[in-house]
Design a protein with these regions (language model features):
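Helix-loop boundary and gating motifs at the non-cytosolic
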Residues: 2-76, 83-105, 156, 162
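Short helix-loop-helix connector
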Residues: 47-49, 80, 142-147
Length: 188
């Protein structure tokens, strides 16, 4: 049984599919470049000997990402337009903190490693918080602009392309970490 698709959604389907596919593919690539499982622990161990600090990476990220969703979900349902909210939160609160991590590492890693570490955790928390606030609205938006029968292929392709780009990204990260001097190698 095929579900009827709203004419407006059908008219804009190619655009919405392509733009969101590119966005998710590059987010997946970006997250592989700064992997919480490999790159972030390596960075933290260059700033401190504390194993607890390494363990805080997934803890801070998870709490900062999942907890806001509990409160943002109701707000997401009540918004008439999701895109402006998602774009603002995504740009300012989800993505900008990662740029600020780079600057923090560049400026403070050598002389003030504890400050660099604290700023790293603050910005990781801020980025995850931004993602957590935006995620319910983003999924609601995707639910409106992509028909049910296109969502599986959308998520499969976007994650697949992002992961394939991440393989190339892993090579670039490996070369960068090896050939660029610390702390510029992590700040790049």
């Amino acid at each position: 049984m095929e579900q009827e698709v709203d004419p407006f959604v059908q008219k804009n389907l190619r655009w919405n599919f392509a733009v969101n596919l590119i966005d998710i593919s590059f987010i997946t690539l970006a997250m592989s470049l700064i992997s919480r499982e490999t790159i972030m622990p390596l960075l933290v161990t260059s700033l401190t000997d504390s194993k607890i600090a390494v363990g805080l990476i997934p803890a801070i990220f998870s709490i900062s990402f999942y907890l806001p969703q509990l409160f943002a979900a109701n707000h997401a349902e009540s918004m008439k337009r999701k895109l402006p909210f998602v774009m603002f939160i995504g740009a300012v609160f989800e993505r900008l903190p990662y740029v600020l991590i780079g600057f923090s590492i560049l400026l403070f890693a050598l002389d003030l490693p504890l400050l660099a570490l604290v700023l790293f955790f603050i910005f990781i928390g801020a980025g995850a918080f931004g993602a957590g606030v935006a995620t319910p609205s983003w999924f609601t938006m995707i639910g409106k602009v992509l028909p049910v029968h296109r969502r599986g292929i959308f998520f499969g392709l976007s994650e697949g392309f992002g992961t394939m780009m991440g393989i190339l990204g892993a090579f670039v990260v490996g070369v960068t970490l090896e050939q660029v001097a610390y702390p510029l190698n992590f700040a790049t």
